[in-house]
Amino acid sequence: MYALNDIVLYKGEPKRIVSLSNEYVETYIKLEDIYFNILQNGVEPIEISKPFLMKNGFVLKKLLVTFDEDKFAKFVYLNDGFAIELYISEKDDDLNVARLVIHKNNVGNMIDVKLNYVHELQQAFRMCNLQYLADNFKI
């Protein structure tokens, strides 16, 4: 399920969703400053990847972290007042976020979720009151 400001692919190009309806998704073409409607089934999710995380300020801290008998790559994002840890599963070549830990005011809030796509990560950040980070991802 998509939400406003989620970033998706349309014809291989990243687009930001600016309105939603049952039949159409209106997306904003950032470089051309024009709006157009597209069928929702023409929209594809963007997979979370290591290059995407690094482009958006996340740093690979440990290549392999083990918990629950699975192996993960640990990425960290640091900013004034908070830190984010993402643990990316490397099981069966399936790259997904298995654990999201957000530290605010020295308190860590852990969310165990399976996130495969950028829009899912954006929505998780919004639920944790990190709207500005979610809405400013670089693709």
PLM segments and residue spans:
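Short beta-strand-centered aromatic/proline hotspots
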Residues: D6-I7, E13-E26
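SH3/SH3-like beta-barrel fold
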Residues: V25-D33
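Intrinsically disordered, low-complexity, charged/polar segments
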Residues: I34-K62, D112-C128
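Amphipathic, interaction-prone secondary-structure segments
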Residues: L60-D93
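Intrinsically disordered, low-complexity regulatory segments enriched in Ser/Thr/Pro
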Residues: A83-N116
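Charged phosphate-binding loop/patch that engages nucleotide di/tri-phosphates or the phosphate backbone
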Residues: F125, N129-I139
